[in-house]
């Protein structure tokens, strides 16, 4: 199993950072390689957590992949991501949003995955650089939205 961890320190409130990451529908506007997002289901659970199931179509290194994730969003604190179907045997992730001082926040991303198939296993070595570009794109979007 491979693991990716990234952390950002931003001069925006945690709630602003959370809103950008939770807005799955907008990913195609700013994430590199994200061709489209289709929200399949949205619901609010009894504990105040919202759950969004979405199909993402992404391209990288000439390979186009489609995957479905379920995102469980604890408002302004955490977003847990779990693969429902796609090119991985397993993909779990978690975004956390922690206030720092009066107007800043720390945003952390942890991903764990097991690639499926020989081609995906070969390409999985590039996931670190893909994650860096993705986190950078989120940081730019968060800062421009605030």
Labelled PLM ranges:
Residues 4, 91, 109:
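Exposed loop/turn and edge beta-strand positions of beta-sandwich/beta-sheet ligand-binding modules
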Residues 1-46:
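Hydrophobic ligand-binding cavity/cleft-lining segments
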Residues 28-29, 36, 41-43, 57-104, ...:
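Hydrophobic-ligand binding "helix-grip"
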């Amino acid at each position: 199993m491979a693991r990716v961890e990234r952390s950002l320190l931003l001069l925006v409130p945690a709630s602003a950072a959370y809103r950008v990451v939770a807005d799955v529908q907008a990913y195609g506007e700013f994430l590199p390689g994200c061709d489209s997002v289709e929200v399949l289901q949205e619901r609010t659970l009894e504990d105040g957590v919202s759950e969004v199931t979405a199909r993402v179509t992404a391209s990288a290194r000439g390979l186009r992949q489609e995957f479905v994730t379920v995102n469980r969003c604890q408002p302004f604190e955490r977003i847990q991501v779990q693969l429902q179907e796609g090119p991985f045997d397993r993909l779990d992730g978690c975004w956390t949003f922690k206030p720092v001082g009066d107007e800043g926040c720390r945003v952390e991303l942890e991903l764990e995955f097991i690639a499926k198939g020989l081609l995906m296993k070969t390409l999985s070595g590039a996931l670190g650089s893909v994650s860096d570009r993705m986190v950078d794109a989120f940081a730019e979007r968060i800062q421009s939205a605030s």
